[in-house]
Amino acid sequence: MDNISTTVNLSDPPKNSIFNKDQVDVVLYHGYCSDGFGSAFIIWYYFKTRYGLEVADKIMYIPCYHQKDLQNFSLEFLDKIRNKNVIMCDFSYKYHLLMEIINVSNTFIVLDHHKTAQIELSKIPNDLKIFCLEKSGVGITWEYFFPDKPIPKFLAHIQDRDIWTYKVPQTSEFITYFYEQEFDFNLWETFLEEQIVDKAIDCGSKWLEYQKIIMSKIIKRTSYVIQNVNNKLSIVLYCNSPEFKSDLGNRLLYHFPFGDFSCVWDYSLYKDESYYSLRSTNDRYDVSVIATQFGGGGHRNASGLAFSGIKGCLPFEKVDDCGLLELFSQSTKGTIDLGEKHSCILFKTKEIRSEWFEQKYTDLIRRKYTNYIYLAFEISDTDKNYTVFQNDKFSLDNITKYTLDEFSKIFQPLNSINSTN
């Protein structure tokens, strides 16, 4: 949808009457998304079973995408929805764009679950929206069109994956197979048969093992950098891949636990656009803030956005890591006995650099290891020696030095994996 100015008066109140789910002309859905297309499929299936295939196919299905620079819709798009009954699924726009759609359509309703849409949707009348954080697009749409029927198994798997609950058995196996299928209503209809779903799970279980091997190879090419993300030094994990984005993004967070969030990206030469999939956890950065900042959307721990051109890195200032990233990647959890046992993290380094005591780096170190009372550094020069800091007093004025023999008597490693938890 091109950025072309229109003459819609946003001050006019919506003229829409109450939306009737049996009178749909246009379906706007989240493009290139199984949850979004699944929502469109549900509407197609509803009309096919109730009114016949010809009626279902007459509905216009339009995929929608987040575009950072979109200010107004093209006249061509607005003409498609003018005086039509429009339903939007698994997607939303900024308030002024929603108002453009509402004002030119005959009736309108939006069904969404994304956190980033919540504020904008709060501005439109309640009878024009259904919003639920606990369900995905297919969950909300199925309940709206088939309130008295349980959600089909394959759609339950899509929802389970989309909101990352994994409460439905064998979701990973099914999704591994299903996400390789085409976005085609007739094909998706075959998955309403549970025996087809069972075959997909059986095949997917084999594919899943191979997928894990491929992802392990991709993860080895991960780059991690420190960037000033909205005035906060953050460690961003970057990985380039057009496939397995969600799985890769989440695995990166566990493989490199010192990361604040992960970013799996790829580039489309055809569209000259870079696509970013951001992932986090509840104790890390809220990536929905970043997505919203650049015209994308999603949830606290799973969001997406796009940029024009090739961009392998988010447009935040890169900061010299001063050796901290190498330091963080070589840490050992343990306890230190100084009369009483306390949590301690042990780093291996050739030297303790003066830059680490600059406020911005000190804040980063203390934040990443906030669960540890003591920070210990193994200095590997001619002979091993150890320098120990109390975390809340991380400065050169508050250190205690130990020899190898002395330190080995007081430090007890818990394991030797790279971890900040």
Swiss-Prot record:
- Name the InterPro entries on file: DHH_sf, Nucleotide_metab_enz
Stored SUPFAM superfamilies? DHH phosphoesterases
Give the superkingdom in one word. Answer: Viruses
What name does UniProt use for this protein? Uncharacterized protein R106
Q: What is the organism of origin for this protein?
A: Acanthamoeba polyphaga mimivirus (APMV)
